[in-house]
Structure formats: C-alpha cells, structure tokens
C-alpha cells in the first residue's frame, strides 16, 4: 500500500540564464536517485523479492489444486485466499513500482490511478486474510467441537468474501472518485510521477480498516491461543508426573521425574510462545512502520517552500517495500506444514532428498500448528497400576478425506472430551523424522488416576 507525496523545491536561476525561460515537461521530471550501480543493485534485490513472492504463493495454489486431501480441508481455503492476495501483490503492484524505482520516473501514464487502487486493495486483502486466519484458528482451539459443526465451506467462503469486499470498497471507489487525494492535482502521472498525497480523513480511516483493527484482533486471538495451549501443556505435564509416580515407587526417583516433567513443560510453553511471536513479529515488523508513516505524513506541513519534508521519499519507499515483503514470507509461515510440504516436494520432484515423514513445525491447515520434534529419540510408554484399564484414543475426524499428518491438536478449557494437545514450535526447514505426542486422555476436571498415557512420549531435548 502506498501513500506518496512529492515536494519540488524551486530552483534559483543561474547566471546567464533567462529566469523567464519556458520549462519543458522533460525538465520537470526528477532525475533518478543514485548512480547506475545503486539502481542496478536495487533492481536485482527487488526482482529477487518479486520472484520469491511469485514462486512461494504459486506453489501454495498449485498444491491445493493438485491434491484432493488439501482441497478437502476447509481451513486451507483461508490459506489459498491469502496466497491469491499475495500473488496479486507480486503481479499487480510490485513490478510497476520496481520499474519506477530503477528508472526514477513513472513510465506508465494514466495507469497510475488504477495501480494505486490495486496497491491498496491487494495489500488490504493480504492483511485481512491474515486476520481471518487468526480468528479461524482461535475458534478451532477455543471450542473445537462447535467449530467442526459450524465451519462449513459456505461460512469460510463468506468470511473470505467479506475480506475481499472490504478491500475493494476502500480502494477502487475512493481512488476512482478521487476522494483519497489531499489536493485535486491528478496530472502528476503525466509528468513522470505517480505520487498521491492522501488526505487526512482517508489516510486515517483506511489505515484503521487495513491494519490497526486487524492487528488488534490478531494480538487478541494469538494471546488467547497461547493461554489455552499453556493450560493444556501444564495439564499434560501433570498427567506425565502422575504416571511416573505410579510406576516409580522410590521417592528419590519420583522426585527426579517430577523435575524433568516440569522442565519439559517449560520447554513446550517456550516453543508455543516462540512460534506465536514469529507469526506476529514478522507481520508487525513488515507493516507497522509503513502505517505509522501513512498516518503521520498527511499531518506534515509541506506547504512551506524551501523546507525539507518531514519524511524523505527514500525512507517512505523503503518501508513500503518492507510491507510488500510480507507477501513473500506468508507462504513460509502459513503453508509450510506437513501436508503442504509433502505436496511441494512432489510438485518440485525433490521428494528423494527428504524423508517421507519429514514435517514442519507450524501447521495452519489443520488445527493451528503441529509440534514435531527434531530428534528421533523416544521414550517407551510407562506402564502403571491402571494399565489393564487402558483407554483407547478417540478416532480421528472422519470428515477429512485426505491423509492426516498432524498428530497433535489443541483442547479447549471447557471441553469435556478427550482431544490431542497442540504444541507449536519454531519453523523447521530441515528434513527430520516425525516424533509426536500421542493422545493423552483427560477430563475437564483434570487427570484421572486410572488413565495411562498411551503411545510414545517425545523427548523434547534442548532448543
């Protein structure tokens, strides 16, 4: 999204030059900033950013189109919508501005107004899709059974339609009606410039819809997700300690087991916090500087001749590209999970370089994120006194037509059914064996003494 302003300082006539001479349009066009080498380097960096954005988001769309089990998951509709909005950023927004950055002038004439509308629409759609994903994950985690009943394809498409409709309403209508400008000068693009000074009303209102309200929603949902995960991690830890105490009658051995369980619980909580910090940190780092300037610049006094602008064009453009760079990072954060990675390796034909059980730590296609540790060490299940009353895990959701690679999920605070624990972790891009924490049965009132922890308990190790 872009908010441009341009202030040209008057030039004093030099000796021997008629001060009343006619200035041609070509002389009005600002010269490119920096030398040839600087502009060449800028072009290479921007080209690499555009290509990476195109490849990453195209892979996401291709994977969903090609593999039926990815299409069968309703939550992947939000990931695809995000990928489409980021593809539009890479096709409709980035290239035109990159050419202008290298050339130093706007070369596309009256396409300027349409480009500004595309810029606002695509950037807003990308951010609103991120907000929709956070809301979807919170609903799935806070009340998983109600979520499974209510999150139909129709409802998912309705949420996506609302996000795109808002994006179109705050972009094309104001821009085409010229409501967004602080002045009525619409001929800037005819002079080799595509800078539009946003008026204060539009700058504030569009920033609220495009960024500030969505970021508040995301902070709230991810904070709540962390608290839910933290509660369930501690509940699982108490179950592990109870099972260990039943199996180990010697007091000193039980004490050692308790200490180890507490350390494991702390490491799991740390991994949850790190993952959610990466999700929010990348988004805020990319977009916050731009939207701060977007609201500050319209209040700058740029009418005083001879005074420098409060924010330089170079600084503003850098932060604009930081925001667009978020579109190249979204596929890595939101689509690099077990399901998508298997699809990517198949599409790219590089499955022989990765084990078939290779997984990623962050999973937004099923629950929120899935935890898979980076070691092959496993602990054998510890039989306790209640082993003869072993409770079998609940079957997985039959509604998923494809293979389910996610072994861990989240339980709500008030849920009375046995569910899997979701333990997110930091993104891992190496080919690693999959180790998971199988289902641990418990009730809403806490661990039951007669329950045995079935399956294998993963050894988290040091981060």
UniProtKB/Swiss-Prot annotation:
<keyword id="KW-0812">Transmembrane</keyword>
<feature type="topological domain" description="Extracellular">
    <location>
        <begin position="181"/>
        <end position="198"/>
    </location>
</feature>
<feature type="transmembrane region" description="Helical; Name=7">
    <location>
        <begin position="316"/>
        <end position="337"/>
    </location>
</feature>
<keyword id="KW-0325">Glycoprotein</keyword>
<feature type="topological domain" description="Cytoplasmic">
    <location>
        <begin position="66"/>
        <end position="76"/>
    </location>
</feature>
<feature type="topological domain" description="Cytoplasmic">
    <location>
        <begin position="136"/>
        <end position="154"/>
    </location>
</feature>
<dbReference type="Pfam" id="PF00001">
    <property type="entry name" value="7tm_1"/>
</dbReference>
<feature type="disulfide bond">
    <location>
        <begin position="112"/>
        <end position="194"/>
    </location>
</feature>
<keyword id="KW-1133">Transmembrane helix</keyword>
<feature type="transmembrane region" description="Helical; Name=5">
    <location>
        <begin position="199"/>
        <end position="223"/>
    </location>
</feature>
<dbReference type="InterPro" id="IPR000276">
    <property type="entry name" value="GPCR_Rhodpsn"/>
</dbReference>
<dbReference type="InterPro" id="IPR017452">
    <property type="entry name" value="GPCR_Rhodpsn_7TM"/>
</dbReference>
<feature type="topological domain" description="Extracellular">
    <location>
        <begin position="1"/>
        <end position="39"/>
    </location>
</feature>
<feature type="transmembrane region" description="Helical; Name=2">
    <location>
        <begin position="77"/>
        <end position="103"/>
    </location>
</feature>
<feature type="transmembrane region" description="Helical; Name=4">
    <location>
        <begin position="155"/>
        <end position="180"/>
    </location>
</feature>
<dbReference type="GO" id="GO:0043410">
    <property type="term" value="P:positive regulation of MAPK cascade"/>
</dbReference>
<feature type="topological domain" description="Cytoplasmic">
    <location>
        <begin position="338"/>
        <end position="463"/>
    </location>
</feature>
<feature type="transmembrane region" description="Helical; Name=3">
    <location>
        <begin position="113"/>
        <end position="135"/>
    </location>
</feature>
<comment type="similarity">
    <text>Belongs to the G-protein coupled receptor 1 family.</text>
</comment>
<dbReference type="InterPro" id="IPR000929">
    <property type="entry name" value="Dopamine_rcpt"/>
</dbReference>
<dbReference type="GO" id="GO:0004930">
    <property type="term" value="F:G protein-coupled receptor activity"/>
</dbReference>
<keyword id="KW-1015">Disulfide bond</keyword>
<keyword id="KW-0472">Membrane</keyword>
<feature type="transmembrane region" description="Helical; Name=1">
    <location>
        <begin position="40"/>
        <end position="65"/>
    </location>
</feature>
<dbReference type="GO" id="GO:0005886">
    <property type="term" value="C:plasma membrane"/>
</dbReference>
<keyword id="KW-1003">Cell membrane</keyword>
<dbReference type="GO" id="GO:0071880">
    <property type="term" value="P:adenylate cyclase-activating adrenergic receptor signaling pathway"/>
</dbReference>
<protein>
    <recommendedName>
        <fullName>D(5)-like dopamine receptor</fullName>
    </recommendedName>
</protein>
<feature type="transmembrane region" description="Helical; Name=6">
    <location>
        <begin position="274"/>
        <end position="301"/>
    </location>
</feature>
<keyword id="KW-0297">G-protein coupled receptor</keyword>
<keyword id="KW-0807">Transducer</keyword>
<feature type="glycosylation site" description="N-linked (GlcNAc...) asparagine">
    <location>
        <position position="6"/>
    </location>
</feature>
<keyword id="KW-0675">Receptor</keyword>
<feature type="topological domain" description="Extracellular">
    <location>
        <begin position="104"/>
        <end position="112"/>
    </location>
</feature>
<feature type="topological domain" description="Extracellular">
    <location>
        <begin position="302"/>
        <end position="315"/>
    </location>
</feature>
<comment type="function">
    <text>Receptor for dopamine.</text>
</comment>
<feature type="topological domain" description="Cytoplasmic">
    <location>
        <begin position="224"/>
        <end position="273"/>
    </location>
</feature>
């Amino acid at each position: 999204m872009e908010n441009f302003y341009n202030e040209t300082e008057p030039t004093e006539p030099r000796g021997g030059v008629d001060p009343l001479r006619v200035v041609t349009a070509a002389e009005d066009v600002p010269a490119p900033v920096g030398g040839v080498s600087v502009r060449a380097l800028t072009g290479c960096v921007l080209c690499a950013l555009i290509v990476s954005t195109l490849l990453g988001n195209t892979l996401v769309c291709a994977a969903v189109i090609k593999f039926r089990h990815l299409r069968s998951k309703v939550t992947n509709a939000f990931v695809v919508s995000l990928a489409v909005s980021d593809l539009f950023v890479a096709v409709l927004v980035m290239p035109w501005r990159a050419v202008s950055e290298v050339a130093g002038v706007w070369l596309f004439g009256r396409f300027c107004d349409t480009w500004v509308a595309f810029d606002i629409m695509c950037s807003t759609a990308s951010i609103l899709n991120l907000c929709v994903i956070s809301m979807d994950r919170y609903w799935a985690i806070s009340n998983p059974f109600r979520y499974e009943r209510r999150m139909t394809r129709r409802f998912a498409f309705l949420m996506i339609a609302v996000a795109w409709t808002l994006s179109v309403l705050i972009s094309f209508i104001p821009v085409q009606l010229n409501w967004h400008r602080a002045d009525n000068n619409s001929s800037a693009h005819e002079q080799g410039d595509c800078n539009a000074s946003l008026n204060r009303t539009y700058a504030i209102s569009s920033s609220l819809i495009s960024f500030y309200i969505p970021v508040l929603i995301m902070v709230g949902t991810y904070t709540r997700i962390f608290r839910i995960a933290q509660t369930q991690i501690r509940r699982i830890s108490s179950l592990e300690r109870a099972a260990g105490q039943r199996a180990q009658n010697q007091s000193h051995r039980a004490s050692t087991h308790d200490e180890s369980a507490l350390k494991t619980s702390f490491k799991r909580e740390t991994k949850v916090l790190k993952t959610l910090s990466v999700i929010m940190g990348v988004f805020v780092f990319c977009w916050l500087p731009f939207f701060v300037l977007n609201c500050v610049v319209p209040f700058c006094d740029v009418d005083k001749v001879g005074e420098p602008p409060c924010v330089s064009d170079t600084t503003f453009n850098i932060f604009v590209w930081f925001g667009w760079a978020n579109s190249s990072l979204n596929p890595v954060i939101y689509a690099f999970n077990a399901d998508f990675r298997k699809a990517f390796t198949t599409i790219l034909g590089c499955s022989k370089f990765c084990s078939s059980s290779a997984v990623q730590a962050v999973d937004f296609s099923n629950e929120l994120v899935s935890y898979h540790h980076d070691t092959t060490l496993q602990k054998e299940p510890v039989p306790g006194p209640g082993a003869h009353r072993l409770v079998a895990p609940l079957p997985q959701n039959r509604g998923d037509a494809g293979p389910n690679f996610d072994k861990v999920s989240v339980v709500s605070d008030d849920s009375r059914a046995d569910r899997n624990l979701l333990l997110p972790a930091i993104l891992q891009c190496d080919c690693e064996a999959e180790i998971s924490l199988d289902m641990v049965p418990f009730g809403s009132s806490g661990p039951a003494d007669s329950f045995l922890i079935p399956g294998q308990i993963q050894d988290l190790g040091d981060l």
